[in-house]
Amino acid sequence: MKLLCLVAVVGCLLVPPAQANKSSEDIRCKCICPPYRNISGHIYNQNVSQKDCNCLHVVEPMPVPGHDVEAYCLLCECRYEERSTTTIKVIIVIYLSVVGALLLYMAFLMLVDPLIRKPDAYTEQLHNEEENEDARTMATAAASIGGPRANTVLERVEGAQQRWKLQVQEQRKTVFDRHKMLS
């Protein structure tokens, strides 16, 4: 994280200061003119001041004769656009730095993961014993509830829950054993 902050600060210091003469990419007047009579639609970009951002100053050469210029210009939509490419570049560098750091962290975790998840034989044996005890208690509970006195709705629901829990426990044990045999 400190490296990322350092890269961002150095990037901001190395970027040249904003100039009064911005390039045509940073400041522009964009006019979108739709089709008019036999003339197809067109987009015009021009580096002009904000007060001159209209069809008469931006659309060059004028595609219509003199008497249709006013009607053509009324159809055109002109917008003044200003952006800072320096800011955009800095944001992209920061974004790529964060993504790169996350990718490095992911690669580190993938390398370290086998060492962290190394199974301990003693812990695995205790886990198996706990599962066997749980399965035995579930089986005895299911046998006692599943008897002839399960007359009420509540007792039937509890019996169904116990049977379901027993089935889930058996399935877990089977899946765990299969997984153990495969690896």
UniProtKB/Swiss-Prot annotation:
What the entry lists under InterPro entries is as follows: TMEM9/TMEM9B (IPR008853)
Superkingdom assignment: Eukaryota
Please describe the organ and tissue distribution of this protein's expression: Expressed in heart, lung, kidney, liver and intestines. Enriched in the hepatocytes around the central vein.
| Glycosylated residues in this chain | N21, N38, N47
Q: Which cysteines are joined by disulfide bonds?
A: none
Subcellular location, record wording: Lysosome membrane; Late endosome membrane; Endosome, Multivesicular body membrane
Keywords, in A-Z order: Endosome, Glycoprotein, Lysosome, Membrane, Phosphoprotein, Protein transport, Signal, Transmembrane, Transmembrane helix, Transport
Q: Where does the signal sequence lie?
A: 1-20
**Stretches assigned to the Cytoplasmic side:** 111-183
> What is reported when this gene is inactivated?
Knockout mice are viable and exhibit no discernible phenotypes in the overall liver architecture and hepatocytes. However, they display impaired hepatic regeneration with reduced Wnt signaling. Knockout mice also show a suppression of intestinal tumorigenesis.
Phosphoserine modifications at: S144
Give an example GO biological process: regulation of protein catabolic process
Tell me the Pfam families matching this sequence.
Tmemb_9
Provide the membrane-side ranges marked Extracellular in the record. Answer: 21-89
Q: Which GO terms describe its cellular component?
A: intercellular bridge; late endosome; lysosomal membrane; lysosome; mitotic spindle; multivesicular body membrane
Task: Give membrane topology per the record.
Answer: Single-pass type I membrane protein
Ranges that cross the membrane: 90-110
**How is it modified post-translationally?**
N-glycosylated.
The free-text domain remark for this protein reads: The transmembrane domain (TMD) is essential for the interaction with ATP6AP2.
The record's similarity note reads:
Belongs to the TMEM9 family.
Q: What does this protein do?
A: Transmembrane protein that binds to and facilitates the assembly of lysosomal proton-transporting V-type ATPase (v-ATPase), resulting in enhanced lysosomal acidification and trafficking. By bringing the v-ATPase accessory protein ATP6AP2 and the v-ATPase subunit ATP6V0D1 together, allows v-ATPase complex formation and activation. TMEM9-controlled vesicular acidification induces hyperactivation of Wnt/beta-catenin signaling, involved in development, tissue homeostasis and tissue regeneration, through lysosomal degradation of adenomatous polyposis coli/APC.
According to the record's subunit comment, the protein's assembly and interactions are: Interacts with the v-ATPase accessory protein ATP6AP2 and with the v-ATPase complex subunit ATP6V0D1; these interactions lead to the assembly of the v-ATPase complex.
Protein name according to UniProt: Proton-transporting V-type ATPase complex assembly regulator TMEM9
Q: Which organism is it from?
A: Mus musculus
